[in-house]
Regions:
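An acidic-aromatic substrate-binding cleft motif
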Residues: 244-312, 316
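Solvent-exposed beta-strand/loop surfaces of large extracellular or lumenal domains
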Residues: 92, 104, 171-179, 183, ...
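C-terminal beta-strand-rich structural cap/linker in extracellular carbohydrate-active enzymes
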Residues: 592-618
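Aromatic- and carboxylate-enriched substrate-binding clefts and catalytic-loop regions
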Residues: 318-477
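Bacterial N-terminal signal peptides
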Residues: 9-18
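Carbohydrate-binding surface patches
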Residues: 529-566, 610-611
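Glycan-recognition and catalytic regions of carbohydrate-active enzymes
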Residues: 115, 500-545, 582-585
Length: 618
């Protein structure tokens, strides 16, 4: 890990702006990323408004935008300042290895500083911690103790994101909702984060949140003063002990959508390092849901998992009674015909883990009783159902619950409306979360491709894939389902959500599912247009997996394999849509030798896909 200190770059800039809510200022203090591509600058505008702006390359992606918050009782931190002082910049260059992830090594490389907006009088100035990465910029508010005042009550946050034009925005109004591409000025209400916008010049911008643990979730609403400005909207007030460090507000930008996915480790870098000393019990893997809630079904799922290279089975809602009733007790098995202990013992003998679903009602009431019981039972993980979300109370509760699960060596999957903000780095027993319109919502490929380039910036998503369910033939294809298993990252990958072991009938493409990893050493997005198509390549050891997904228009893409090791021959196993295949899934398989000079021509049908495994062995 390397540190170096630099003098802060200062500049005097006269702006010819006269746009409502995008204010002009004269003196700007600047912090640049290590490669110089990103620059975040600070100044004071009219009425002492604290301002920042962001540049990516030669382009200004965030125009002068307001900062600050308002306390309960009226104390206002959004104006009255006379000066912006940017402290000495520090260069940080380190790396760390995640317990699991999309890459085996994460570089943490940025310039950081603290900016202080000063104002006259006894009130403290507004202080921010700022980082400029090669992939984006981030800042968070710092509030220290003030005399005898040891806490703060924040009513609302006023962080603005003022854009250069009425950009097209990929809007989603709930974490599991459907995306629509609209102008900023056409947003109906507050939208989820990450929020991705596309400029006329082809640049892609993302606004995100990182390290949300004990604070209210940020959403983004259109400003009442400017149709091209988004303003942070907290899900309720915040009460915090001082000193306070808020979650990070993140601005990313790139010249292509795939670069934002390749850079999504930025959110991880903004979270604290792993706090679990012994992580040997944390195990990624593939999952089948047991839909009959029976002993026989559980045993069959274990056998299926062993045969097809899965690592877990899951019992979902109903195993302990009606999840909607408080009278149900998750400390006991109430489902007739289910000997859960027998299934767990059988699974353990076969090195298969058992995951249990518990509704938030019973977790909130009984978590401290449940965890030692589940440890004795020998379960591998918990799926939190219908978690309360958004406000500070339930955000804090959920993170505390995940930390408690770690004490009992229990892994966690969170459903339904929650989206990750990088805290899986700190507690890597937090395996995945929903917060996506996955296969339960039967998304056509155009929605899947919107999710891929928007939601997946936030981190792992439990997509609850279905493979044999009848909806697949209505909105996508089976080859596309295989491709999505590569494109969408989750260390716990639910591959058979509505399916049963009896659904499988010896389909030859199951060789792909058996070989498929769920964690990776490297990620590359080779092609991509939001909502239209994507080609995602992931490496595990010496092998590569390439997922090619397409929306409405049939197309052929050229895929260069120049990322393969030179002077080495591989074998490409390609799984594609084939109406003439003699199976109900209509997946054809072809094999050919390839090397780093190979360029694959990949045809994809409307709402189809192609999955490719490139193996280094014979």
């Amino acid at each position: 890990m390397k540190y170096a200190r630099f003098a802060v770059i200062g500049a005097v800039v006269l702006l010819g702006l006269s746009v409502a809510a995008c204010e002009a200022a004269e003196l700007w203090s600047s912090l640049a990323s290590p490669d110089g591509m990103f620059r975040i600058e600070f100044s004071v505008g009219d009425k002492g408004k604290p301002l920042y702006r962001v540049r990516h390359g030669e382009d200004e992606v965030i125009l002068p935008s307001g900062l600050g918050f308002v306390e309960v009782g009226g104390e206002d931190w959004t104006g009255g300042y006379v000066k912006a002082e940017l402290g000495e910049a520090e260069l940080h260059d380190g790396s760390w290895r995640p317990v699991w992830g999309e890459r085996s090594l994460v570089r943490d490389h940025y310039r950081g500083a603290v900016v202080l907006f000063r104002r006259p009088g006894p009130l403290a100035g507004l202080k921010l911690e700022v980082r400029a990465y090669d992939s984006g910029v981030a800042f968070r508010y710092l509030v220290g103790t003030r005399g005898e005042k040891k806490s703060i009550n924040i009513e609302s946050e006023k962080t603005e994101f003022c854009f250069t034009a009425d950009h097209k925005t990929w809007a989603v109004y709930s974490a599991q909702g459907k995306y629509s591409k609209v102008k900023l000025s056409e947003l109906r209400s507050s939208v989820e984060r990450p929020c991705v916008l596309e400029t006329e010049a082809g640049k892609v911008i993302a606004i995100a949140e990182a390290a949300l643990v004990d604070y209210a979730r940020m959403r983004l609403r259109r400003s009442e003063d400017s149709p091209r400005t988004l303003v942070s909207r907290l899900h309720g007030p915040v009460t915090a002990a001082l000193p306070l460090r808020t979650p990070w507000r993140v601005v990313m930008a790139a010249d292509r959508a795939g670069k934002l996915l390749e850079n999504n480790h930025l959110l991880l870098n903004l979270n604290e390092p792993n706090k679990i000393k012994d992580t040997s019990w944390i195990r990624p893997g593939k999952v089948i849901r047991e839909v009959t809630l029976s002993t026989k079904g559980g045993m069959a799922c274990v056998d299926f998992a062993v045969e097809h290279g899965l690592q877990f089975i899951e019992y979902d809602a109903g195993w302990y009674g009606d999840q909607g009733k408080l009278t149900s007790d998750a400390r006991t098995v109430s489902r007739g015909g289910l000997d859960l202990q027998a299934v767990i013992r059988y699974a353990e003998k076969n090195n298969i883990g058992v995951i249990l679903y518990v509704n938030r009602r019973h977790l909130e009431r009984d978590l401290d009783d449940l965890l030692p019981i589940y440890r004795r039972w020998g379960i591998a993980g918990l799926k939190f159902g219908f978690v309360q979300h958004g406000d500070q109370k339930w955000t804090r509760w959920m993170h505390e619950a995940i930390a408690k699960c770690a004490e009992y060596e229990i892994m966690v999957d969170v459903h339904d409306e929650y989206r990750m903000t990088g805290w899986e780095r700190t507690y890597p027993n937090f395996m995945t979360a929903e917060g996506i319109g996955g296969d339960e919502t039967r998304p056509p490929n155009e929605q899947a491709l919107a999710n891929l380039f928007n939601r997946m910036i936030a981190g792992p998503a439990d997509h609850t894939f279905c493979y044999f369910n009848g909806y697949v033939d209505q909105t996508t294809s089976h080859a596309a389902q295989l491709a999505k298993m590569i494109c969408f990252f989750s260390p716990w990958q639910f591959l058979f959500w509505y399916d049963q072991p009896s659904s499988a009938a010896g389909e030859p493409e199951f060789e792909f599912i058996t070989a498929l990893p769920t964690t990776w050493d490297e990620l590359r997005v080779l092609h991509g247009k939001i909502g239209r198509y994507a080609v995602v390549a992931r490496r595990k050891g010496d092998d590569w997996y390439i997922g090619c997904l397409n929306a409405r228009k049939a197309r052929t893409l050229e895929v260069s394999l120049d990322f393969l090791a030179a002077d080495k021959t591989y074998k490409a196993h390609t799984y594609y849509d084939d109406p003439g295949a003699g199976t109900r899934t209509k997946v054809g398989i072809s094999r050919r030798p390839v090397d780093s000079k190979t360029v694959l021509s990949v045809p994809m049908s409307e709402r189809g896909g192609v999955a490719i495994r490139i193996s280094s062995g014979k």
